[in-house]
Amino acid sequence: MKKKNGEDRTYVLDSSAFLTMFEDEDGADVVQELLEKAKREEIIIFTSFATFAEIFYVTFRELGEKEARNRVALMNELTISRAESTKELGIIAGRLKATKRISFADAWIAATAVFYDATLVHKDPEFQQLMDKIRVIELPYKKTA
């Protein structure tokens, strides 16, 4: 959904966007700015139920259960709308998974962007193949040594 001035009004944050923010990586400022706009009700941010699971398990593996719970609790306090599994989202996610080389969780996250006609904010190379189906904001990828 777009504003009258042509700017996007609806966004979906991928797990990588949240991790960028939590770990203060390049692009964290972009995520923070979007969250501030959502708080001021200038935009709407959706986050897939799959994102909550991804944040939990990735953080659990790297930093332990306590930090995983802390991050999910913080996400629950943000001005975002959690997109739960629905029949319509399931069909869209299933179609994406069947036709693209994409993980199960990323299929749900991308389906959320398709369903809400939203711009997906991410830094996950898997989403590059979907640029004909969704609008994206690509955050800077991690630099490798």
Write out the residue ranges for each language-model feature.
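Active-site neighborhoods of divalent-metal-dependent phosphate/nucleic-acid chemistry enzymes
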Residues: 81-121
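Helix-loop "lid/cap" segments that line or gate small-molecule binding pockets
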Residues: 58-61, 79
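A generic structural signal for short hydrophobic patches within well-formed alpha-helices
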Residues: 18-19, 52, 127-128
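Acidic, PIN/NYN-like endoribonuclease modules and their adjacent C-terminal/linker elements
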Residues: 1-10, 110-145
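Anion (oxyanion) recognition and catalysis
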Residues: 39, 76, 114
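Short, well-structured N-terminal submotif of metal-dependent ribonuclease cores
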Residues: 1-47, 60-73, 143-145
